[in-house]
Structures are given as structure tokens and as C-alpha cells.
């Protein structure tokens, strides 16, 4: 079983965690000019 050789400092652990981020969906402009999320139905026109 693998065991850490030495303790990881708070700073080093925080630097590693900077890459753990949530990617937000990018809104797309629809044909009628309103913004919507991709792969969602437009509530005004009913189009996908």
C-alpha cells in the first residue's frame, strides 16, 4: 500500500486544488434573439 513519504503543506495542497473547478455551460443565442443553454428547448418558440 502506498504511503506518503512526507506531509503535504497547506499551500501545496491548495495549489493542486486550483484546477478542481466546475465548467459552466455557455449560453447560445437562439434564432429569435433570446439566450438559452445548449440542448434545451426554447420556452417561447418550442424549438430545440
Swiss-Prot record:
HAMAP family in UniProt: Ribosomal_bL32
GO biological process: translation
Keyword Ribosomal protein: yes
UniProt record similarity statement: Belongs to the bacterial ribosomal protein bL32 family.
GO CC annotations, alphabetized: large ribosomal subunit
One Pfam family per UniProt: Ribosomal_L32p
Regions of compositional bias (Basic residues) in chain numbering: 1-20
Keywords in alphabetical order: Ribonucleoprotein, Ribosomal protein
One MF term in the entry's GO annotations: structural constituent of ribosome
InterPro entries: Ribosomal_bL32 (IPR002677), Ribosomal_bL32_bact (IPR044957), Ribosomal_zn-bd (IPR011332)
Keyword Transferase listed: no
Highest taxon listed in the record's lineage: Bacteria
Descriptive protein name: Large ribosomal subunit protein bL32
Ranges where the record places region Disordered: 1-48
